[in-house]
Amino acid sequence: MMRCENMQELKPIKEGKVREIYDNGDSLIMVATDRISCFDVILNNEVTKKGAVLTQMSKFWFDMTEDILPNHMISVDTKDMPEFFQQEKFEGKSMMCRKLNMLPIECIVRGYITGSGWASYKENGTVCGIKLPEGLRESDKLPEPIYTPSTKAEIGDHDENISFEQSIDHLEKYFPGKGREYAEKLRDNTIALYKKCAEYALSKGIIIADTKFEFGLDEDGNMVIGDEMLTPDSSRFWPAEGYEPGHGQPSFDKQFARDWLKANPDNDWTLPQEIVDKTIEKYLQAYKMLTGKELA
């Protein structure tokens, strides 16, 4: 076991909206906090157990998809980590990961038309520049999943949707001569992962309407899944039972929180406890349905 002379001195090297990342020499330790963000803003509430759901659900999907693409996970057992992370507050929320050179694209895949995609479709029949068939209803399943990349925003900024061609140009700035190759790999891996996981989830009673992946390159230049994977934070999960296109669907994700914030614009980014409780109830329900286990 690694020892830490003064456990209080360990500080994250990067703090995202929800995650804290610590340097562990040749690896990183990613801690999913109980913070919740909506509309790219960190809310004032914390949602107890949320961080553990994110970490353990990511582990579940990482294990399931190793046949498609490797991932950055090394361990979620804090006994494998420095002593600092063996405090109770880190239990279940921490993941030791390989260091990657992260690619500057958020890889969004949509299997159903909803949210901002539905708003765009109603306006001009497209989603992120992709022309879709006429006559779609809100929440309809798309003929095929569509890939709609975006740039990665700094905290406080908004991600910007871009076309596939723009993603090539964006990647080319960071990886000269590799823009098209990496853009195509990101698209193809994103859709392959979504198709496999959406089929599995549907067999467990959950529709994955859309989700977001992030990828990086390992030391050998191989593409690897990073960040989180198919969690209620990065995805829209709907119950398959009662699914009915033509309107919005109930969800197992933070849509509860989003809906309340939209309905209460003078909210000061603070949720009522009732909405916090309903949100974690949905997260835990989704975890149990997908994994067959209660969260420890």
Positions of PLM-derived features:
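Conserved metal-phosphate-binding beta-hairpin within the catalytic cores
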Residues: V109, I208-M229
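Coil-to-beta-strand transition motifs
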Residues: S27, M102-P104, K204-I208, D220-M223
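Active-site loop/lid in soluble adenylation, ligation, and acyl-transfer enzymes
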Residues: M1-E154, N267-A296
